Design a protein with these regions (language model features):
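Buried hydrophobic-core signal for structured, non-transmembrane domains
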Residues: 1-5, 51, 67-72, 119-124
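Extracytoplasmic
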Residues: 9-11, 46-48, 64-66, 89-91, ...
């Protein structure tokens, strides 16, 4: 359950939705069901949104699944027509772990990092969702790179931004894993695999 508070001075309409990611099935796979999907919240009041785990057919029960849950507020425009009010949207990461999957507190140890041309590539070899700070540092040049996204789904491979290019041959890199509770873990240093 997620509690959403309206700390503003006007009522808002709260819309809650689940967004699929790159490895979701192309069809509908309602992994999480939100209730209520829409609700009015008056100033100083709260709304509880229940996040329920569904069991869609064909769901891979050998690996973790991740979805983004969005909470979007739509402000009441009131009676004045010449006002500007801004919609805000907040994203929360929701990860479902199959009961048969053993807990792993450091799944980032299974990441496979390598040079790919003038960029860096990382593959998640585990059945776990791995979250990372998007910035990595390549050694010995101390060059900064930014990953395409701040997470890797099981079996997924991502690279660094296309605008980031290596200036010298790298031998290792530093990255910052993010724990299941959203906290940054101290930097990890790994050796880079040879170019393939």
């Amino acid at each position: 359950t997620v509690r959403v508070d309206n700390i503003g001075n006007y009522p808002v309409l709260l819309f809650s939705s689940v967004v699929k990611n790159a490895l979701s099935k192309q069809g509908e796979d309602p992994l999480f069901i939100l209730s209520p999907p829409a609700a009015r919240i008056d100033p100083g009041k709260s709304q509880l949104v229940r996040v329920m785990l569904a069991d869609p057919p064909g769901l891979d029960k050998t690996r973790q699944q991740m979805r983004h849950i969005y909470f979007q507020e739509i402000p009441d425009m009131g009676e004045k027509s010449n006002q500007l009010k801004v919609n805000t949207r907040h994203r929360v990461v929701a990860i479902a772990t199959p009961s048969a999957l053993v807990e792993n507190k450091s799944p980032w140890q299974t990441l496979h990092w390598q040079q790919n041309g003038h960029s860096i590539q990382v593959k998640n070899l585990s059945p776990y969702v791995i979250r990372l700070a998007p910035s990595i540092t390549v050694q010995p040049s101390n060059q900064q790179f930014v990953l395409e996204q701040p997470y890797l789904l099981p079996g997924q491979t991502i690279g660094t931004r296309k605008s980031d290019r290596l200036t010298s041959p790298p031998s290792r890199l530093h990255f910052t894993p993010i724990s299941n509770t959203g906290r940054a873990i101290p930097d990890i240093t790994v050796n880079l695999a040879p170019i393939q």
